[in-house]
Amino acid sequence: MAAAASELLTGWFLFGLALLAILIFSWVYVRKYQSRRESEVISTVTAIFALAVALISSALLPVDIFLVSYMKNQNGTFKDWADANVSRQIEDTVLYGYYTLYSIILFCVFLWIPFVYFYYEEKEEDDGNTCSQVKTALKYTLGFITVCAVLLLIGAFVPLDIPNKKNSTEWEKVKLLFEEFGSSHGLTALSFSISSLTVIGMLAAITYTAYGMSALPLNLIKGTTSAAYERLENTEDIEEVEQRILRIKSKCRDGRPLSSRDRRAVQQLEERLRTLRRRERHLETIEKSWWLKFCEAIRPLKIVWGVFFIIVALLFTVSLFLSNLDKALHSAGFDSGFIILGTNLTNPLNMLLPVLQTVFPLDYILITTIVMYFIFTSMAGIRNMGIWFFWIRLYKIRRGKTRPQALLFLCMILLLIVLHTSYMIYSLAPQYVMYGSQKYLVQSNKTIDGQPKNVTTFVAKDCDADAPEDQCIVTRTYLFLHKFWFFSAVYYFGNWAFIAVFLIGLIVSCCKGKKSVIEGEVDEDDSDMSDDELSAYYC
């Protein structure tokens, strides 16, 4: 029992270290993008908290895999302390950890973040008393609470039974997975709500992460245009616009007023001139900065990172394609959510992770790296595209200039994407997520000189769907991902969409030229007040 406590303590100690790193990262990440001029304490704290909770929930995945793997020895036998009661206790600890974090996520998505968002919307429109702003924010937030309540009610009573097919052992195995997860209505309701949010996270991942996986590495490889060259072009544009304004105004030298068409043209040209002069100030700042010289010095390193990221992106895409193809060919079909027990078509990541787990904690490091890679590529996609509602761009995400409302949107999108990350990792490495590095004993007859003898030996074999139920422990993560077969079917088709969007984004990113050295920092719809936050940290 002492050994069990030691193993459990080791896993949770590493989780604690990951928690500390996540809190530091979330604080730096939010502070990096928030507007210094419009910074608000409550929105900053909310954004940091929401992002940290999402990352912490993703950090539970490797802890779950670590604990089920360390219950068994490499020879396929259970460790002395890992009896049935202890194993169930450890599994339940991880499961309760998931439900605690997921309950907090529901609180953030359906109550806290909407309330803070609407509060600041009201604060901008009405400078009246705080009580009135809080009441209005609560009124709008009530709609989100209603949606949450509906999801919980549906989840509590939605049927979990998968359609019955006779004479199929695969169907029987899939059904056992659903039965093992339990039938508590409260936990089922929570699972349904989280799965619904994960579907939204899947859509966000298809939109932003898939594009960011191609845009981020190619931008690193191509680099940015020269600040001096851009400034020269900008100066020429300023002179051209000034001359056009003078030509139009020269029409009224004899006292005649300008026509309405000419007045509109002058107004548009003057707005264009203001934008160009703002660009001039930004380019002058960046051209004189030491940061530009530093970026030029590390240019070879950025190219190396870009090549590495594009290789990783292609590796992920190939692994995801092979995993989805395996489901299409060997799963029980649509009615089971394309659930597959074991792997028939292996992929690079599914082969690599069990090997790394033998040298603890390399697999933990790789999983953390994968999660962070998804976060960075998602952020790259959001920053390049902005936050859109259909064809309307709501907010732009810019370093040091992001409004409080946009920051809340950003963290909610990242929170939903990270929720979907667990299924993405399962899609990339299904065998690893299901069993980790567990092995079980298989009986084998020993032969001597080609003659079978009555000597029975046992050899260790990697856990798969053919293993006896009492010999291999399925992770709580895997069971949680497949609690509702219809969500699994949605995730399956979402993976194909993810691959398609990545390939389209790769083509678009290849066709685009170099980015401006001040890309996204100066737009025509910006106010001149935004220049109060001039920054040299563009590259």
Swiss-Prot record:
GO CC annotation, single: plasma membrane
Membrane side Cytoplasmic: residue ranges: 29-47, 119-141, 207-302, 383-405, 505-539
Glycosylation sites: N75, N85, N167, N344, N445, N454
Extracellular side: 1-7, 69-97, 163-185, 324-361, 427-483
InterPro entries noted in UniProt: LMBD1_LysCbl_Transport (IPR050854), LMBR1-like_membr_prot (IPR006876)
GO molecular function: cobalamin binding
Record key words, sorted: Cell membrane, Cobalamin, Cobalt, Endoplasmic reticulum, Glycoprotein, Lysosome, Membrane, Transmembrane, Transmembrane helix, Transport
Keyword Transmembrane helix listed: yes
Cell compartments where the protein resides: Endoplasmic reticulum membrane; Lysosome membrane; Cell membrane
Keyword Endoplasmic reticulum: yes
GO term, biological process aspect, one: protein localization to lysosome
Annotated membrane topology: Multi-pass membrane protein
Transmembrane segments: 8-28, 48-68, 98-118, 142-162, 186-206, 303-323, 362-382, 406-426, 484-504
Family: Belongs to the LIMR family. LMBRD1 subfamily.
Physiological role: Lysosomal membrane chaperone required to export cobalamin (vitamin B12) from the lysosome to the cytosol, allowing its conversion to cofactors. Targets ABCD4 transporter from the endoplasmic reticulum to the lysosome. Then forms a complex with lysosomal ABCD4 and cytoplasmic MMACHC to transport cobalamin across the lysosomal membrane. May play a role in mediating and regulating the internalization of the insulin receptor.
Protein name: Lysosomal cobalamin transport escort protein LMBD1
Taxonomic source organism: Gallus gallus
Encoding gene per record: LMBRD1
